[in-house]
C-alpha cells in the first residue's frame, strides 16, 4: 500500500513543475490523487488507521499515527480533486485509466463507510444518471465481467489491466507483473495452489432460489467449484478445465476429497485452457456498476427513501441473471420494512459480489463485527468467526517491525 502511495506522492510533488499542457497535467495529477485515495481507502478498511504521508520521503523518515477520520478526510480531498479533473471516459489507447465515474464511485463508497449516506447518494447518483447515456450499465452476460472476452465494458467502473503477453519463467521474472496471478493461487489443488476457498453455506444460499426458467443461479456455477455442481447445472459443462480425459463427471478428480471443499471459480481461466499460471490475461474489476446499483439502493433507504424505490435497483441486478423481482420472489416480505430490506440486501450483495473484495467493508459498515448478535450470525455460517474477538479482530495489527522503527510515533491497534 505505502509503496503505491510513495509513487503517487512523487507524481503529485514533481509533475506540477513540468512544462506541459495544463489539461493533461491536471489529468495526470488527478490519476495520482485517485490512486492514492484507493490505497488509503484500503488501509482504513483493514487497519482503521494508518500513517498519512503526502510527500516523497526518504529512509530516515519516521511516520506517525493518523486516525481513521484523518485518513477519510484525505481520501475525500483526493477524490474530489480527481472527480473534478478526470474525464468521463478515455480513448481506446488509454482504456483502464481512472475516470470521473471511478472517482465518484470510490468517494461514494468512502462516504458510506462513514455512514454519510446523503453524500454517498449524491456521488453515486451521477453514475446512475449516466446509465441513460450508455456510459454505464449492466452487460447481458454476467460471466463476461470475469474473463478477457469483454473487458472495459459499460459495467466496468474501474478495472486493473492485465495480459499474458511476453510470458516468462515463474519465480521473480518481471513479466509476471503484467499477468493476473490470483487465478493460480485460488485454483483447486492439482491445477493451482488452492490457497483460497469458499464455504459451503454460500453454495447453499445460491441454491435457495431458482431462476424464472427453473434453473439454478448461473452465478453459482461461475463463482464456486464444489462437489455436485454438475448435478445442479446439467446443461453446463461438467469439465471446468479443457482436459482431454473427461470420463469423470467433475474433472479433475484430485481437486478435493472432502465433500465440503469449495474452491473459488470466479476469474479462473478454464474457459480457454487446462491449467493456471502467473500469467492470466483477464482484467481485475475493482468496481462494477452492479456494485453501484446495490450501494445506491442502500443509500436510498438509509436516507429515508422508500423500500419500493430502492428495490428497483436490486431488481436490475437480479433480472440480469434471470431471477424474479423481489416482490415476486420468496423474499417478498423484505419489502415490508427498511430493516427487512437491508437484511436481504446484505445477501444480495454477497451473491453478486462474492470474492471481489468488498465483503469486509460491508460487514464493518453494517456493524456486524461490533456486536455479539452480528458475530453469532456470521458464526452460524462460517466457523472462521468462532474465535472472533469483538473490539480486536475488526482490524489488523500494525506490523510490529514498523512500530519498532518509528521511534515511538506509531502505536499498536487495541488488544494486540
Task: Give the predicted meaning of each segment.
Residues 80-81, 97-248, 375:
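An aromatic- and glycine-enriched ligand-binding surface/loop that stacks and positions planar moieties
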Residues 43, 114, 301-303:
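Structural motif corresponding to the intra-repeat A-B loop/turn of tetratricopeptide repeats
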Amino acid at each position: 500500500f505505502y509503496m503505491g502511495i510513495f509513487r503517487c506522492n512523487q507524481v503529485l510533488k514533481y509533475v506540477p513543475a513540468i512544462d506541459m499542457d495544463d489539461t493533461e497535467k491536471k489529468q495526470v495529477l488527478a490519476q495520482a490523487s485517485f490512486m492514492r485515495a484507493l490505497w488509503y481507502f484500503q488501509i482504513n478498511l483493514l487497519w482503521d488507521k494508518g500513517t498519512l504521508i503526502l510527500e516523497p520521503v526518504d529512509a530516515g523518515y519516521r511516520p506517525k499515527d493518523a486516525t481513521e477520520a484523518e485518513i477519510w478526510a484525505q481520501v475525500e480531498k483526493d477524490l474530489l480533486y480527481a472527480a473534478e479533473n478526470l474525464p468521463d471516459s478515455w480513448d481506446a489507447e488509454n482504456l483502464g485509466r481512472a475516470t470521473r465515474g471511478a472517482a465518484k464511485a470510490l468517494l461514494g463508497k468512502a462516504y458510506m463507510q462513514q455512514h454519510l449516506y446523503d453524500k454517498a447518494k449524491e456521488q453515486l447518483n451521477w453514475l446512475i444518471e449516466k446509465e441513460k447515456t450508455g456510459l454505464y450499465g449492466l452487460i447481458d452476460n454476467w460471466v463476461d465481467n470475469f474473463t478477457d472476452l469483454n473487458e472495459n465494458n459499460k459495467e466496468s467502473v474501474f478495472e486493473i489491466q492485465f495480459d499474458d503477453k511476453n510470458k516468462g519463467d515463474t519465480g521473480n521474472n518481471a513479466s509476471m507483473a503484467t499477468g493476473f496471478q490470483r487465478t493460480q493461487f485460488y485454483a483447486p489443488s492439482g491445477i493451482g495452489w488452492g490457497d483460497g476457498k469458499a464455504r459451503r453455506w454460500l453454495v447453499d444460499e445460491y441454491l435457495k432460489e431458482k431462476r424464472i426458467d427453473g434453473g439454478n443461479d448461473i452465478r453459482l456455477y461461475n463463482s464456486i467449484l464444489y462437489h455436485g455442481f454438475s448435478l445442479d447445472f446439467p446443461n453446463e459443462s461438467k469439465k471446468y478445465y479443457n482436459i482431454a480425459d473427461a470420463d469423470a463427471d467433475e474433472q479433475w478428480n484430485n481437486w478435493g476429497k472432502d465433500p465440503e471443499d469449495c474452491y473459488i471459480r470466479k476469474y479462473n481461466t478454464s474457459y480457454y485452457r487446462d491449467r493456471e499460471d502467473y500469467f492470466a490475461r483477464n482484467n481485475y474489476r475493482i468496481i462494477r456498476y452492479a456494485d453501484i446499483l446495490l450501494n445506491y439502493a442502500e443509500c436510498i433507504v438509509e436516507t429515508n427513501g422508500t423500500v419500493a424505490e430502492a428495490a428497483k435497483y436490486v431488481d436490475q441486478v437480479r433480472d440480469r441473471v434471470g431471477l424474479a423481482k423481489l416482490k415476486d420472489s420468496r423474499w417478498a416480505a423484505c419489502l415490508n420494512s427498511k430493516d427487512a430490506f437491508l437484511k436481504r440486501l446484505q445477501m444480495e450483495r454477497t451473491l453478486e459480489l462474492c470474492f471481489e473484495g468488498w465483503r469486509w467493508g460491508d460487514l464493518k459498515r453494517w456493524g456486524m463485527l461490533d456486536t455479539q448478535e452480528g458475530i453469532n450470525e456470521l458464526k452460524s455460517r462460517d466457523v472462521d468467526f468462532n474465535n472472533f474477538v469483538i473490539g480486536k479482530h475488526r482490524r489488523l495489527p500494525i506490523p510490529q517491525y514498523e512500530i519498532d522503527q518509528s521511534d515511538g510515533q506509531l502505536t499498536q491497534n487495541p488488544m494486540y
